Each structure stands twice: as C-alpha cells, then as structure tokens.
A protein has these predicted regions:
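Charged, glycine/proline-rich intrinsically disordered loops and linkers
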Residues: 188-232, 240, 244-248, 482-509
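A general alpha-helix detector
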Residues: 58, 85-89, 265-266, 430, ...
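ATPase nucleotide-binding head domains, primarily ABC-like/P-loop NTPase cores
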Residues: 300-301, 308-548
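Glycine- and acidic
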Residues: 67-71, 265-273, 346-350, 430
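Amphipathic alpha-helical domain-onset/packing element
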Residues: 274-308, 314-323
C-alpha cells in the first residue's frame, strides 16, 4: 500500500463528481485490512511515474491471476471473509496478558495465514506477486496449537503445562469421587425409602401429593427450589462430598493461577511475532485490494493506462462508469467518447442533453483513477500525472449557506484558481450560467484568456459559442443529432408521451465529440429537441431568425 504523503490531489467534491468515490464504494473488499488500505489510498504525483508503473504491473499481474484462477480466487475471497482485525490484540500482547478469546483470535488469524500461504505458493512457485506472499508463521502457530490439530478452536490445553495437566487430573478424580459417593447415596435412599432420584440427584414432588410430608422428613434430602405447584428436593452433601468439594475449590484457584501464567507466556510469544503478524496483515490487505482492483477492471472492461512524461490526457472510447452502470440497469447502452487534452484550454459546446457534463466528468475520471493506481474505463488511455485535479460543477450547497448559485460558483472558482499549480487539470461545467448572458459571456471569455496562459489542462463546457473564437482554444462539439434520421425519429416520437419522447431522443443522440477547426454553422440541436418535445413551430421558426 502507498503511504506517507499528505498531498491532496483533489477535494471531496471532485472525488465525488469524477466518480472516484462511487468506484471505490463499488469495489468488493473482504478483509478489514484491505478496506482500511482502500480508505487510506494515496495518489501518485509527478515524479513518481516509475512507482505508479510498478503498481499497475501488480494490478496487471492480478488481472492475469484472476482470469486464470477463478476457483482459487473464490477460495481466497472465502478465506478473507472470515478474517478479523486483531491489530489491537497484537499490540496489547506486548505489555498485557491476553484473554482466552483474544488468543483464539490470533490462532484463527494464523490458521488463515497458513491457508493463504498454501493457496498462493504451489510447489515452491508464487502464484501472486512477491509483495503479497506472507511470511511463514508456523512456529507461532505450533506454540498456540501444541497438538498440531490445526482446528479453528482454542483452549488452554494440558500440553501447555505439566502442572496444569496434574491439577486438572486431580480435579477430575475429585469429580469422579463425588459422583461415586452421590450414586451410592442415591441407591441407599432407594432401598431405604423407596424413592428414585434423577441423574442430577434431585426429586420434584407435587404440593398436592401425599408423599410430600414423607419426603420432607427424609434427613438426607433438602429443599432446593419450589413454585406454586411443586417442591424440588436435592441430595445433601455428605462429609466425603464436602471434603472433595473443598479440595476442588482449592484446585480451581490453583488452576486459575496456572492458566493465567500460561496465558501470560502465550501473550509474550505472540508479542515476539508482532512485527511479522502486522506485516502479514498488511500483505493480506494489499492482496485483497489488488484483487478487488483486478476484479473490478475485468468486470467493467477497464484497461491499463499508459503513463506519459508530458502532461496529457488522451482517451479513446472512454466510459463514465457511474453513468454506464445506470444505463445498464435500464437496459441501455453507453456511447463511448474519445478526447485528447494537453496544456491549454479546450471547450466543449453543444445543446443540453448532449452529454457535455458526462464527457467533462469522464475527462476527470480517467486521470484521477490512473493516479490512484486503477485501470481505466476506455479502449485505450494515455495520461501524464497531475499535481492538482479540480472540478467546478453545480451550486455546492448554496441553498444551505444562503448563497446564490452564482455566488457559490465564484467562491469555488476562486479556490480552484488560488490552488492551481504546474500540471493541473481544471474542469469547469457551464461557468457563469447563473447570471445574465452578457456578463456571463464576458466572464467566461476572460477566464479562458486567463487559463490559456497557465500550465494547466483546462476543459470547459459552455453554451457560449464565441468563447471558442479565442486564439489557441480547442473547440470540441457533441455530434448530437447531426447524423440522425429525423424522419425515422419523428415517426417514433409522434405518439410517445413526455418521458418516452426524452428517452427516444436520447437513443438517437450521438454523444461522441468532434473537433471543430473553424466556426461554421451554429448547431441547432437545441431547436430540434425543443421542436420534437412539442414547442410550437412559430417559436422555433422565430428563434431561427436570431441565429446568425
């Protein structure tokens, strides 16, 4: 696991909006160690490309392992489900005497480690990368399991101490002697009074029974319990039973002391292996996390990203995993998107419903997943590491804070610009859409002028087409309905209700991006969509007059 850096790549909102949190929450981890490592996972930064490549090597190895060893993977996962976090117990063993249940937990962990080692190493050959191979802890297991039964139970066994064995043997003899004395007394009462005591050496008599007075008068019995229906009598202890019972009380005290001495010894033995156990737990967690990464990559058709030295994000047929999962649940297909970004400003233009925001999030999802050592949802991807990735989208709790959406947006923009550094990725969705169009356009153009001079990859979605006229700005447009068969679309939508119409239009939308080298005819997707959703022709035709 990657540790030791407190640098922040992205804030909480960006992690959420790019889908990083969603993906991490969707991963199936089974050990407390793996879950902890996922929660504490740190990203790789520029200058750490070689370390990241090694991490991706490990994930790639695990992908091959998972693909070729499905049954073994199931065994490991089943084993991991039974593993408990005993880190606190291991730490306690260094200065305190562990309870029996705590020693049992350590033994259970050792058995799991032994089984995992037998699964991951066959005939002297490692089936998983060396980083995940546990150190052998058989010596400690032998200490806790002197009989070498390798059963997942624990008891302070006689093998731990000769004195313990002797005390328990004497106690058993006392119990046998007491039992023998009680049985003899039971037979005596049977012959003398004609009554038969139970195997527990008692008898229950109804309060309405004529025998109650007779049995109450038997000197060898005493009342032990009663309710409104009956009275239970039990055998009085004889002098012999009393002596053996007294001896057993003394033996119990000696046994308690000896068992504590054994537990103290076992705790000390466990403490000697504290570092090894802790390291093995880390390896189990790392294997759990690597398997989860691999399984997620396989199930979601993710690929290993190529790590570039230069600051770029190149995505071929990329997919936003969260949106794709939603579409799959509805039986719909996701339209993959390709985009190539480098330092400078790129603007995505097009109508609403065109998927601009999804493409923006995808452009953040791929690099942030890469820097956390994940495979990415694309046919191919090439990523140069960033120092900072931030996304500005939505109104960020403006209602709770009493701010307008525009005011909140400006606060977020200030934070992003204040923290921007070399090799940053800045993702901005529809900036200044919450204010009047004249000022909104002016602010957007000025922001583009500012960002184009910075060593950032800046990607902005906008309705303001003229923003792309700035020299050096790359203009990407959503293809939308440009290639749609409107005759077919109109026939299909003619008798549909409102919800069905939106779904039908979405089906015909082409969400892929195309680069616009020269500003030509303004796209009319918004007018086409408005018309198909029932806006009057008079309004649509009137709107066309204002489009230049």
């Amino acid at each position: 696991m990657r540790m030791g850096t407190n640098r922040r790549l992205a804030n909480v909102k960006t992690r959420h909006e790019t889908g990083l949190d969603y993906i991490m929450q969707s991963m199936n981890l089974n050990t407390p160690f793996g879950k902890k490592q996922l929660k504490e996972l740190k990203p790789f930064f520029p200058g750490e490309e070689e370390e990241l490549k090694k991490e991706l090597d490990r994930v790639e190895s695990m992908v091959s392992f998972v693909n070729g060893n499905s049954r073994t993977v199931e065994h490991i996962q089943e084993l991991f489900m039974e593993v408990k976090d005993v880190s606190y117990t291991i730490a306690r063993s260094e200065n305190q005497t562990l309870a029996v249940v705590e020693i049992y937990e350590v033994k259970s962990l050792l058995l799991a480690m032994r089984k995992l080692l037998s699964i991951t190493v066959k005939d002297g050959k490692n089936l998983v990368p060396e980083d995940y191979i546990l150190e052998d802890t058989t010596e400690l297991l032998d200490v806790l399991d002197p009989g070498k039964d390798r059963i997942n139970t624990f008891y302070i066994y006689d093998e731990f101490s000769d004195k313990l064995k002797e005390l328990r043997a004497e106690k058993r003899q006392c119990e046998i002697a007491i039992r023998k004395e009680q049985k003899a007394k039971r037979e005596e009462l049977k012959e003398k009074y004609g009554i038969m005591l139970t195997p527990k050496f008692d008898i229950s008599v109804s309060k309405s029974s004529p025998d109650l007075e007779k049995i109450s008068g038997i000197p060898e019995l005493e009342a032990a319990d009663q309710d409104y229906l009956s009275v239970t009598f039990q055998l009085k202890p004889t002098e012999t039973v009393y002596e053996y019972t007294k001896r057993m009380e003394n033996l119990n005290g000696e046994l308690e002391e000896e068992e504590e001495r054994v537990r103290k010894h076992l705790s000390l033995e466990i403490s000697k292996y504290a570092d090894v156990l802790t390291a093995n737990c880390e390896k189990m967690g790392a294997l759990d996390l690597a398997m989860a990464k691999a399984i997620y990559a396989i199930s979601h058709d993710c690929v290993r990203p190529e790590i570039a030295d230069e600051h770029v994000v190149e995505i071929e047929d990329g997919r936003n995993l969260q949106v794709e999962d939603i579409l799959k649940s509805k039986g719909k297909k996701y339209c993959p998107v390709s985009i190539s970004l480098k330092d400078g400003v790129t603007c995505i233009t097009g109508a609403n419903m065109g998927g601009k925001t999804i493409s923006l999030k995808l452009s953040g999802q791929v690099p942030i997943l890469t820097q956390y050592g994940f495979f990415v949802p694309a046919k191919k991807a090439r990523v140069g590491l960033s120092n900072y990735i931030q996304m500005l989208i939505g109104d960020s709790q403006s209602v709770e804070r009493g701010l307008s959406s525009f005011g909140s947006e400006m606060e977020e923009l200030k934070e992003i610009l204040d923290h921007g550094v070399d090799r940053s990725i800045i993702l901005i969705d529809e900036i200044a859409s919450g204010t009047n169009p004249v000022e909104g356009l002016a602010l957007t153009r000025s922001l583009v002028d500012y960002l184009i001079k910075k060593p950032y990859i800046s990607l902005i979605t906008t309705h303001f087409e003229t923003v792309t006229e700035t020299e050096g700005v790359v203009n990407m447009q959503v293809k939308g309905l440009a290639d749609a068969d409107f005759n077919l679309l109109n026939r299909e939508i003619q008798y549909a209700n409102r919800r069905e119409r939106i779904n039908i239009i979405s089906k015909y939308m082409d969400y892929r991006l195309c680069r616009v080298e020269k500003q030509g005819e303004v796209p009319k997707d918004a007018l086409n969509i408005a018309k198909m959703l029932g806006i009057s022709s008079e309004i649509i035709e009137g709107a066309k007059k204002y489009i230049k």
